[in-house]
Every structure is written in C-alpha cells, then in structure tokens.
C-alpha cells in the first residue's frame, strides 16, 4: 500500500483558543529566511497540547529515537536524561495508517511531491494534474521538509513531513503519512541525522492517561 501523496480531504476543526503564549507566537512565527519564505502558522484554533514542548519521557527507546504515538497524536524525539521533545501530529485515516519500525533513509528540504496511482484513482480531479510531480513550495502537501522512512533499506513510501493544513494537526486525516506544523518539521529535521531510528505505534498509547498527565505537566 503506497501512500506517498500524503494529502487529506477533511475540513478544519474549529477549536477556538482565547489566549496564546507569546513564546508560541514566536515559535510558530514567520521564517523569511527559508528558500520559500514561510508565513506564520495560525495556531489560534489548535489545541495547545499539540504545540511543541519539552517533556519528561518514561519510554524505553534510546536517545535520538523518534517515537510516533498515533493514538495520542504525538511525536517524541527522545533526549538524554529522561526527556523528550514532543510535537503534535496528524496521522493516517483508519485503515490507512502505517506502523512499525524504520529509519530515516533520507531527508529533503522543500521536497517534491508526486501522487501515487492509487491517489489519482481516488481523487482524479484533485491529483491527476500532478501525476508528473509538484515542485517544492508553499502549496506542496509535504510542506517545508520531509523525512523518508526506510525499513531494511527499502523505502516504505511513508514520510514525516510538513503540511499546508495546520488545522489537521491533532486529527486523523492524511493518507497514511505523519504530518507536523511546518515550523515543527523544520525543527525536527535539524535535530535528526539520516539513519535515526523511528518507531510508529498504532492501536496503543505510549503512555497511559496518568502518565500522559505527568508528561504534560513536566514541561
């Protein structure tokens, strides 16, 4: 099942947030230094638990490992000393989500996107015109960066990538890939080398509810 296209068709979820921490306004602010100058991400309708933060980490994975908890909609980059950077994510729809162990096989800045044949068949009016590929840019579904997941040296066709749909973070909407805010994928990209291990969990939470409360309050 190849789902490299990583696009979604679900509309935004309206979840108003009255106040935004100025630190987060800066964190998700514009990036004019990018090859395609990146505007600020509107986080006013994003559940604040999906905004990037450092947390206590009680998992067993080694530092440098990326752990994707699809049930909780979090991605963790494990650090030393029982800590991790936690990012909010959007994940694949039920029946399309991928899970397992992989490694970062390659990395790309403002990556090119090509819809798969299956994606074109499902939504020809949306995807057929890009059968030859779409160059990187602000309208590209992969966003500002992409990390390509490989298993035993073989491309799994799944990516950790940015998004043109920031409202989708925290939701189950994409076609199998794992999406982050563009500012977050830029941050993650800068921290992980090719070869970094990735664990994608499905059907289970990395932490139980009590542990998640402890993790979130540890920031």
Regions found by a protein language model. Name each.
Residues 1-178, 182-219:
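N-terminal pre-domains immediately preceding structured catalytic cores
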């Amino acid at each position: 099942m190849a789902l490299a296209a990583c696009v979604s068709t679900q509309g935004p979820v309206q979840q108003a947030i009255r106040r935004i921490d100025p630190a987060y306004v800066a964190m998700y602010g514009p990036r004019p230094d990018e090859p395609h100058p990146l505007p600020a991400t509107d986080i006013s309708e994003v559940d604040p638990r999906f905004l990037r933060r450092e947390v206590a980490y009680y998992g067993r994975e080694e530092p440098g490992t990326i752990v994707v908890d699809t049930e909780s909609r979090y991605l963790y980059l494990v650090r030393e000393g029982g800590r991790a950077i936690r990012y909010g994510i959007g994940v694949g729809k039920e029946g399309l989500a991928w899970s397992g162990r992989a490694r970062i096989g390659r990395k790309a800045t403002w990556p090119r996107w090509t819809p798969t044949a299956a994606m074109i068949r499902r939504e020809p009016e949306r995807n057929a015109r890009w059968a030859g590929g779409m160059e990187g840019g602000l309208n590209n579904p992969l966003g500002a960066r992409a990390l390509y997941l490989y298993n035993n040296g073989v491309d799994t066709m799944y990516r950790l990538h940015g998004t043109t749909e920031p409202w989708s973070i925290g939701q189950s909407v994409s076609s199998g890939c794992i999406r982050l805010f563009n500012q977050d994928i830029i941050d993650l990209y800068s921290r992980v080398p090719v070869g970094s291990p990735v664990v994608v969990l499905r059907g289970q939470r990395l932490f139980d509810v009590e542990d998640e409360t402890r993790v979130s309050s540890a920031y």
